[in-house]
Curated annotation (Swiss-Prot):
The keyword Isomerase does not apply. Pfam families: DUF520. Nucleotide-binding protein. This is Nucleotide-binding protein HS_0688. Belongs to the YajQ family. InterPro entries: DUF520, UPF0234-like_C, UPF0234_N, YajQ-like_sf. It comes from Histophilus somni (strain 129Pt). Keywords: Nucleotide-binding. GO terms for molecular function: nucleotide binding. GO terms for cellular component: cytosol.
Length: 163
């Protein structure tokens, strides 16, 4: 019986490259001359810390980071950007988390979406991924298109396709 897995993964070396590119752009921006501003990647905690002197500049820095991520084919909704910023002394900062894996609530939404479409496939949650199996490849391809076109707020990849 054919099957595949729905996963949500970000390659850390692409994130590292995006952060380095964003820092390079930051060093050439005129509006950030003489301003203490940093974009730092913590690979172990899978977070990006963005720090600068004002709230407005913080939003500008996040836009620079998002554009660098998009250039590296990392979708911006794979970054979990908090709404409010932390303020300590003269610096504002935000701790941006990277969305790795599919949480249980999101997996349940995916399964509900597939069941509501009445496709002839079986779904099951396996840790941080969703396994989809069915009798025909056409049903599996329809499932892939359904999940791709759904606005679930997280990018998904499809791997481990077996016949």
């Amino acid at each position: 019986m054919p099957s595949f897995d729905i996963v949500s993964e970000i390659t850390l070396y692409e994130i590292r490259n995006a952060v380095e590119n964003a820092n390079r752009v930051l060093s050439t921006r005129y509006d950030f001359r003489g301003v203490e501003a940093t974009i730092e990647l913590n690979e172990k905690a899978e977070t990006i810390k963005v720090t600068t002197e004002s709230d407005f500049q913080l939003e500008q820095l996040i836009e620079i980071l998002i554009s660098a991520c998009v250039k590296r084919d990392i979708q911006h909704n794979s970054l979990d950007i908090p709404a409010d910023s932390e303020h300590s002394g003269k610096l504002y900062s935000k701790e941006i988390k990277l969305k790795q894996g599919i949480e249980t609530d999101m997996a349940k939404k995916i399964i509900k979406l597939i069941k509501d479409a009445k496709l002839k496939v079986q779904t099951q949650i396996q840790g941080e991924q969703v396994r989809v199996s069915g009798k025909s490849r056409d049903d599996l391809q329809a499932t892939i298109q359904l999940v791709k076109n759904a606005e679930l707020g997280q990018p998904f990849q499809f791997n481990n396709f077996r016949d």
